[in-house]
């Protein structure tokens, strides 16, 4: 436990930032899981309603990732990689749905 006042403040700031980082990362994971779940449902039975919901979830997930980047919680390249992988998953599911339909 630090004795110097500035060191005590640094500990408080570090804890506050750690809690904020946990919240942002958890939010990204939650929205990613929601997106992937709905995407799996779309892959099983493609429909316009589910596709619209999947695209809305993708936009929300991208927004959360961008907010985490802006807050400095994740690195820019990490955010870009996550977004790219989500987009690739959507494109793969759309291609499979078209192959199934056609």
Curated annotation (Swiss-Prot):
GO terms for molecular function: small ribosomal subunit rRNA binding; structural constituent of ribosome. One of its GO terms (biological process) is translation. Keywords: Ribonucleoprotein, Ribosomal protein, RNA-binding, rRNA-binding. The keyword Zinc does not apply. It holds the Pfam family Ribosomal_S20p. One of its GO terms (cellular component) is cytosol. PANTHER family: 30S RIBOSOMAL PROTEIN S20 (PTHR33398), SMALL RIBOSOMAL SUBUNIT PROTEIN BS20C (PTHR33398:SF1). Binds directly to 16S ribosomal RNA. Belongs to the bacterial ribosomal protein bS20 family. This is Small ribosomal subunit protein bS20. It comes from Gloeobacter violaceus (strain ATCC 29082 / PCC 7421).
